[in-house]
Amino acid sequence: MSLPRLAITAGEPAGIGPELLIRLAATSVAADLIAICDRALLERAAARCGLSVELVDDDGLALDQRLAGTLRVRHAALATMEVPGQPDPRNARYVLGTLTDAAEGCSSGHYDAVVTAPLQKSSINDAGIRFSGHTEFFAEYAHADVVMMLASPELRVALATTHLPLASVPAAITRVSLTRTLHIVHNELRAKFGIAQPRIAVLGINPHAGEGGHLGREEIDVVIPVLDELRDKGMILLGPLPADTAFVPRQREHYDAVVAMYHDQALPVLKSEAFDSTVNLTLGLPFIRTSVDHGTALDLAGTGRGDPASLIAAVNMALELVARRTSPPPAPPRGEGRDEGPTLAGTNG
């Protein structure tokens, strides 16, 4: 039986990504790893890591097994040689080209999934290219409505908004957008994670989930009407919950995933608990995409000391999703539907 084919993009050439790919290749992970990257960049990364990795041109043929210390490469040429720790905007189009190549390969079935290493958003924007992140790039490529989810072995968190200034968040969360987000999360928990009837905790926007309108009306005007409508259609939705108590360990048994309203509302909890094992994945795409949950670590680039744990976790999750993709979504159990879940008290914080 042939191994799943995973496209791996190396991200920012001056960052830690190329070295992480080399360290990944040194493991015995059971996948056909195809690095979409400049070949010489990988050779220099291997030298910095002090590792001997055999780089093989990707011929597109299926592999039944992969030896540790081997990595297939789909070469893409850098515009200019990297200087570790110093991103160069001249390489921005190279970086975006690797993402396009991966997306096209996944869409055609050439790859089973794409796993992305971190890139430097500021460098791409400095090149005059408007760029918000991987999630938005793949959404635009696929013309798809997507949701960013970060998942650890203990917790799954999806975001109603992603890379927005905090002041822009309330206006960005509308009944239409929140309904769309919850539909995507519900459907993908069933399809990708095999959860027959997902239980989704939805956080409020304001402290204490608005305190009955005394700390903001977004919950009353937007969140509660959406939750009520979707509960009537059979979804199990808890909330809106105050974010300060929603992550208390004893409460987690009541839900399968959390929908947070903005980037820094929930991710600090997740990253503080499971930084090395948290994976970023994009829900709603027609293909599987996972990623590390850390940045380019420019201070470590070139030292050979980068930890590949998050990249390995992203690869393992991609493999799990590929394996599960061949199974039909589970049928929801009968007799379940409207459930507002537990009442989680706020704090005086």
Predicted features along the sequence, with ranges:
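Contiguous, glycine/small-aliphatic-enriched amphipathic segments in soluble metabolic enzymes
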Residues: M1-G133, V176-M261, Q265-I288, H294-P330, ...
